[in-house]
Amino acid sequence: LHVRSRRQRQMCIRDRVGPNERAKTVLFQILSGQMEPDEGSYKWGLTTTQSYFPKDNTAEFDSDDTIVDWLTQYSPEKDVTYVRGFLGRMLFAGEDGVKKVRVLSGGEKVRCMLSKLMISGANVLMLDEPTDHLDMESITALNNGLIKFPGVLIFSSRDHQIVQTTANRIMEIVNGKLIDKITTYDEYLESDEMARKRFVFSVAVSYTHLTLPT
């Protein structure tokens, strides 16, 4: 993936493989270095630093650390007040910081992961379904943070508001084919050209899987 223009910074990846969402998750795992591609290659720019929000964060919280201790390990600044400031942006207040990460709810774990992204200082953020388990207040806080983020965002989300207000480039995976368009989400959905491409890719795959009688 190569973003040529500095203005093309927020990309949303939309998966149309149906109930199998593995395709986009595999793409994120490849881009984050967690998985090697079967073929092809990609290269990050020399000045980029990346941070990844996985769809499954279970392994991240298999410890007895408190929230503050857990986040401090990812912070370039180890001052507790500094770390608590990032937690506060994701609606963790006061005594929340001494909770053990092992017992956090799904929504609290997501907010911890988002705090980790922010505190990392990375200029490329990759987020795979970041709104899962979040309530409306947390989704609004996330949306505001993504809008203000000055770097590159590559994300997937089912939340229409976040995609519409944040993304200026839509990449859609249709049965293994990639549609790539610099546009807002609503314009993408209303585009006859994009609808034709989705139809052509879907029909092509249907013919590919057609078995003739012998």
What are these regions (language model features)?
Residues P54-E129:
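ABC-family P-loop ATPase nucleotide-binding domains
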Residues E129-P130, D135-E137:
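Walker B catalytic motif
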Residues E190-L210:
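Charged, heptad-repeat coiled-coil alpha-helices that serve as long linker/dimerization "arms"
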Residues V163-T165:
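A short, surface-exposed alpha-helical micro-motif characterized by mixed small hydrophobic
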Residues L1-R9, I13-D15, Y207-T214:
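Single conserved hydrophobic/aromatic residue that forms the stacking wall/gate
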Residues I13, P19, A23-D79, K109-C112, I139, A167, ...:
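ABC ATPase nucleotide-binding domain signature region
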Residues S157-R158:
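H-loop/switch region of ABC-family ATPase nucleotide-binding domains
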